[in-house]
């Protein structure tokens, strides 16, 4: 894949996200969202899981502008993504759809293109 430090970190994050089976239905994304929250918190974000369904929370992450006492101070950027996936039939795959395996220069798994890769980026 890439030798760039940020790219390597994104690859590892994506590989880990793929290993969470978040097939919808039933849409059990909580564990993946908690993992993402921990990753973002370690980078200085304030994170909160919100949602009507306990196993399908939304992750809201805020990063305060440097020196700002209020999270609402300064410009706002909203990034929207999802970590649920559709059903995969492992027998139809060359690589396990929940392995996050890197092979032949590609990272394989359910969500590698839609949309766990964009979330990891």
What are the residue ranges of the model-derived segments?
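Acidic/His- and Gly-rich active-site-bordering loop/insert found
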Residues: 2-115, 119
């Amino acid at each position: 894949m890439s030798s760039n430090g940020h790219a390597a970190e994104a690859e590892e994050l994506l590989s880990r996200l793929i290993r969470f089976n978040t097939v919808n239905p039933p849409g059990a994304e909580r564990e993946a969202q908690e993992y993402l929250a921990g990753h973002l918190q370690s980078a200085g974000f304030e994170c909160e899981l919100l949602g009507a369904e306990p196993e399908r929370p939304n992750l809201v992450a805020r990063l305060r502008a440097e020196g700002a006492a209020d999270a609402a101070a300064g410009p706002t950027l909203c990034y929207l993504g999802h970590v649920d996936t559709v059903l995969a039939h492992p027998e139809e795959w060359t690589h396990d759809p929940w392995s996050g395996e890197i092979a032949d220069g590609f990272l394989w798994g359910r969500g590698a293109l839609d949309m766990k890769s964009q979330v990891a980026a």
